[in-house]
Amino acid sequence: MTMVHSLTINQLIEKLRGGELTSRQIMEACLNRIDSVDGKLNAFISYDVEDALAQADIADKARSEGQEGPLLGVPVAIKDVIAVRNHPLNCASKILGNYQSPYDATVIKKLREAGAIIFGRVNMDEFAMGSSTENSAFGPSRNPWDIDYTPGGSS
């Protein structure tokens, strides 16, 4: 079986277009990987399994009907400072509580237009004021190559 987490985005797109993988298979692999490593890394603040799989199924149906898009069916996690309509927007802070964004940021609109699956929010420094996630209300993230180190700064 293909180790989805080790593929580049171009390789994922090639396998999707070639029918070697479905969006659902990729999404399931991503969710399984998150479940297996995020306890150590603390990279994700939140993600919605049901919504992610539903989006993957929609992408697979679209592809089966001949639709295409540059990112159709590719999972994308979003930094917790970018607005996604009807999803929590914390900016890695407890101060915003359960705030739900009433709109999509322009980058989210563009990703959706390209067919991307927006499925999770990733950790960062509170209000993007730092470079190590040590100041996140959700705890620090860890470097996936060596968990004794910070994963580094911002985008």
Model-predicted segments: where are they?
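An N-terminal boundary/leader segment
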Residues: 1-48, 53
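Immediate post-signal peptide segment of exported/extracytoplasmic ligand-binding proteins
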Residues: 59-75
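Short glycine/serine-rich loop/turn segments
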Residues: 72-155
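Secretory-pathway/luminal and periplasmic proteins that interact with or process carbohydrate-rich
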Residues: 35-40, 66, 83-89
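Long amphipathic alpha-helix in the N-terminal Rossmann-like dinucleotide-binding domain
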Residues: 50-57, 115-116, 125
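Short alpha-helical functional segments enriched in proximate histidine and acidic residues
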Residues: 33-37, 55, 59, 107-110, ...
